[in-house]
């Protein structure tokens, strides 16, 4: 089926952990299953709403992080007034009923806002430290550590073609969308 899993030793249950086709192979030949790392980042970092790892044939992993605008405001990293406008666009893009024209306009505004937040060094450092904390501490091997992050406010959604109808990230589409912008 292409699914990856493990047996829970305590119960004997099969736990699905990811898909074989999602495997990232670094330039040093190490194979990395991104799902457990992505799950750790989203659960440990309040600022990150969604994440996808990239790094195929590269030297290290890069996390494409969709940030939560409300969490940014609560952390004092973004003005609450600006966040109100961003949240309207964020919710519009996440609405599967959003018409194509409105969704494209909302995505464009979110991309512009994303370009602005990338110049906020304090915000970037806080996101990087949160991602590094989530992937360090012995839970993951050395080559599974995320070395760089790319932040955006545009969510992975059905309306912008980055999520399937079953809410799975379309990894190829996300990688193509950000290939020119990733370090």
Where are the language model's segments positioned?
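AMP-binding/adenylate-forming catalytic core of the ANL superfamily
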Residues: 2-140, 144, 155-158
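Short Cys/His-based metal-binding microdomains
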Residues: 161
């Amino acid at each position: 089926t292409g699914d990856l899993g493990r047996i829970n030793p305590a119960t004997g249950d099969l736990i699905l952990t990811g898909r074989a086709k999602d495997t990232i192979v670094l330039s040093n030949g190490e194979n990395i299953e991104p799902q457990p790392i992505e799950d750790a980042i989203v659960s440990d970092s309040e600022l990150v709403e969604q994440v996808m790892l990239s790094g195929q044939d590269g030297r290290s992993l890069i996390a494409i992080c969709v940030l939560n605008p409300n969490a940014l405001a609560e952390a004092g990293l973004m003005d609450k007034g600006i966040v109100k406008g961003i949240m309207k666009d964020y919710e519009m893009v996440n609405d599967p009923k959003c018409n194509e024209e409105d969704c494209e306009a909302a995505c464009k505004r979110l991309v512009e806002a994303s370009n602005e937040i990338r110049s906020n060094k304090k915000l970037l450092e806080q996101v990087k430290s949160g991602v590094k904390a989530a992937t360090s501490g012995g839970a993951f091997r050395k080559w599974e550590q995320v070395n760089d992050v790319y932040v955006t406010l545009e969510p992975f959604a059905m309306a912008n073609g980055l999520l399937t109808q079953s809410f799975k990230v379309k990894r190829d589409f996300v990688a193509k969308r950000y290939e020119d912008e990733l370090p």
